């Protein structure tokens, strides 16, 4: 347990201010008479719970539903619920103190990945340990990062196309064997077909494999349309540099692609010339005062939330 800060002690001794309690105390105090969930003999046993947190309480910066959970359990749950399609990259050439804040924001908005460009050692202070719940990757240069990211996108497109091909092949085989008679002309996706995904001579206005087993024609259309939409989103993926420079596009009018990589620079110098060169788009936040730029961590938060406002459902 960390020792209280002397300033916090003095503030409490003064009687002002009164803060609400954050987190929970030891399990024995908050769940009187209830068996511990880390006891294998307990009917409430759950391997996600951390014994030390149950003993000492949990004051971490996590949502209440994750109280007492291990770090790995929280990370796995975030993965299971699905991370958002934007990724965040930060240039770490100046050991900027804002990087930790950016990583914390990426966690809050459920970014798919966080990329640190430059030295492996980065200023974690502002992250408040949230990097533990993220997929963080290191890259020696911005060029290597962008090349790696584009290859990953190409791989995701190929995987989706293979999935569509497998669906088409499955249905084709069922039709030939007599199990799917009439199936090929029962469903037509007149808009947004995945035409390039099918083996030669095989139409893609066919249902999905899981639907074929149930005879659900609506499921055929829905599943194939979802693959088609995913491929379109991946093909529209872009690398977006966030910096206020001549020729940049105002964020207020910019439509963020669903799949994208956001590049952020350091406080002061901003993004490197190579990052700006490799970006598909350069976007800036409109400002109306005398200051040349806003804090790098704040700019990153505004940018990520702009994506959230366009693509994510509100959360309570």
Where do the PLM segments sit?
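Post-transcriptional modification and biogenesis factors for structured RNAs
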Residues: 1-316
């Amino acid at each position: 347990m960390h020792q209280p800060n002397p300033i916090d002690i003095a503030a409490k001794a003064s009687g002002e201010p009164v803060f609400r309690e954050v987190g929970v105390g030891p399990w024995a105090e908050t769940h009187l008479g209830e068996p511990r969930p880390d006891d294998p003999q307990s009917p409430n046993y759950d391997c996600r719970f951390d014994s030390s947190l149950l003993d000492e309480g949990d004051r971490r910066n996590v949502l209440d539903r994750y109280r007492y959970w291990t770090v790995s359990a929280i990370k796995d749950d975030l993965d299971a619920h699905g991370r958002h399609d934007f990724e965040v990259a930060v240039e770490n050439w100046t050991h900027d103190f804002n990087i930790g804040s950016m990583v914390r924001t990426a966690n809050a908005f459920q970014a798919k990945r966080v990329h640190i460009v430059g030295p492996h050692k980065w200023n974690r202070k502002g992250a408040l340990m949230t990097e533990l719940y993220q997929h963080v990757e290191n890259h020696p240069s911005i060029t290597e990062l962008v090349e790696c990211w584009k290859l990953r996108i190409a791989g995701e497109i190929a995987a989706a196309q293979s999935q569509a091909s497998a669906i088409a092949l499955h249905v084709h085989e069922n039709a030939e064997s007599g199990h799917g008679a009439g199936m090929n002309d029962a469903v037509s996706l007149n808009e947004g077909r995945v035409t390039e995904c099918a083996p030669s001579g095989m139409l893609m206005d066919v249902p999905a494999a899981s639907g074929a087993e149930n005879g659900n024609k609506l499921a055929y259309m829905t599943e194939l349309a979802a693959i088609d939409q995913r491929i379109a989103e991946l093909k529209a993926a872009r690398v977006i540099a966030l910096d206020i420079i001549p020729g940049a596009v105002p964020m207020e009018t910019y439509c963020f692609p669903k799949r994208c990589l956001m590049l952020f620079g350091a406080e002061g110098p901003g993004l490197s010339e190579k990052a700006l060169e490799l970006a598909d788009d350069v976007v800036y936040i409109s400002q109306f005062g005398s200051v040349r730029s806003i804090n790098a961590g704040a700019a990153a938060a505004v940018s990520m939330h702009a994506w959230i406002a366009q693509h994510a459902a509100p959360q309570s």
